[in-house]
């Protein structure tokens, strides 16, 4: 029987006519771009020497634009994605891709999303158990209107910022203007005092000639005009 069942499985050809290919490809491309941008920001923030603020701001603006694109794409294909049911084919490698299969077949929200929903309900102060369905629909409609308004305002501000000249050339000019200027040896920060020299000065009122602390104190005195602070031998 097992051989017959295996032969039947081999003869069955999957029907991909109902798969929403364009919708899935569009969402996949938008998510891939957003993931790449988020990974780049994470790498920039993980460096020992932080990236210049204007470069980081430019990257964040790109990421926000891609996030808006993902949201718009999901809204455009909302009906198609909501009506799509995911199920594995007989040849799906369940052993090597168990986590992916579990994620696709999950019926409940992940714990993080459940926590977000709980926090949102508590922050809204709305008790859905004590309200009628039409009242809940009005609240959801009002929330959608507010979200749409906020998205439009953000899009206008983003376009305004782009039109004001935050281009690559402007950022390069700004970067050159913010580069550190070379200073003379006298203007550079002096080396810190040595603990031993500080203790000697506090106890005896003098420091050893030629020490780094002596040089630092002498330089500071010359700059301030007060040369009587250090006691002579």
Curated annotation (Swiss-Prot):
Give the UniProt record's GO annotations in the biological process aspect: negative regulation of transcription by RNA polymerase II; positive regulation of transcription elongation by RNA polymerase II; positive regulation of transcription initiation by RNA polymerase II; RNA polymerase II preinitiation complex assembly
Subcellular location as annotated: Nucleus
User: Which stretches does the entry tag as region Disordered?
Assistant: 204-233
Taxonomic superkingdom: Eukaryota
Show the InterPro entries listed in the entry.
Answer: Mediatior_Med8_fun/met
**Which GO terms fall under molecular function for this chain's record?**
RNA polymerase II cis-regulatory region sequence-specific DNA binding; TBP-class protein binding; transcription corepressor activity
Keyword Cell membrane annotated: no
Composition-biased stretches (Basic and acidic residues): 224-233
Record's GO cellular component, any one? core mediator complex
Residue stretches of biased makeup (Polar residues):
210-223
Primary location recorded for the protein, binned into one broad class: nucleus
Q: What family classification does the UniProt entry report for this protein?
A: Belongs to the Mediator complex subunit 8 family.
- Which PANTHER family does its entry note? MEDIATOR OF RNA POLYMERASE II TRANSCRIPTION SUBUNIT 8 (PTHR13074:SF9)
Q: How does it assemble?
A: Component of the Mediator complex.
Record-given protein name: Mediator of RNA polymerase II transcription subunit 8
Recorded source organism is: Candida glabrata (strain ATCC 2001 / BCRC 20586 / JCM 3761 / NBRC 0622 / NRRL Y-65 / CBS 138)
